[in-house]
Amino acid sequence: MEIQMSDIYCEGDLYSNDDSVTIYMTPATPLTYENNKWVYHQMPDVSQFKEDMRRQQVLHADNGVLAHLKFEFPENVKPNADMMQLLRAEGFQVGNLELYMIEATDLRQLTGPSLEIEPVTLENMADYMHVYEPLSIQFGADYIKESAQALLTHLKKASRALQPYIAYENAQPVGIMNMIETERTVELDGFAVAEEARGRGVGSRMQAFVGEMARERPVILVADAEDTAKDMYMKQGYTFVSFQYSALKELTVSVPH
């Protein structure tokens, strides 16, 4: 089975899609960069990217998305020297996400402490946020508030592709994760273990649960190429599939129309 970055789920609202670029625009979550981005299918040249910067800035401003610009480049294509020079000159942070996969049978071999892992509901949403908030406060109180509202809205949907889960140990919330199930794959996203619960195999036991849910489907995830988390995934048996460069510019002033 061929796995690609296009198999990775995006919670953002699809604004437009053509052979060149897919645009996600989600005014309800303006501080969630992942939900407001342009994904290139063909690598733009420098002049095209300059024009797209201007177009994205206007589109974002028209929709109340004032904090950033974000672009993702085609899978397995590194921006050339001219593009990298432009990105740095324009104040973009250049990132590199890596796609990993593992067979569900391998995940099921992981061990850890006894946990109760439950889907997030309106009734236990506060437990999810109890783990989420300390790990995300670095992005600001407004981001936490937006995330909580987005989760509440999401949980009220009759059907949803993404299902959040909470892991409890001795009735205390110690871990959170999102699972996106399709016929082909199960994606693991938003995976986090509370600081005080780390180093005891909680994360391994949570992933074993994902392996159980996946049955025969491969499990996929993305990790930052510079993040130490990817080393953990590789030790657990995940294999590298592909990479994708991105460019993020955080804006500190209001965007003019």
Model-flagged regions — what are they?
Residues E2-S6, M43, D106-A148, P256-H257:
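Short amphipathic alpha-helix that is part of the acyltransferase structural core
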Residues F49-Q57, G190-E195, G199-E212, D231, ...:
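Conserved acetyl-CoA-binding loop-helix of GNAT-fold acetyltransferases
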Residues F49-E116, A247-K249:
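Acyl-donor-binding surface of acyltransferase catalytic domains
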Residues M1-N63, K78-N80, M84, S147-Q149:
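N-terminal charged segments
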Residues Y143-A192:
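A conserved beta-strand-loop-helix scaffold within acyl/acetyltransferase catalytic domains
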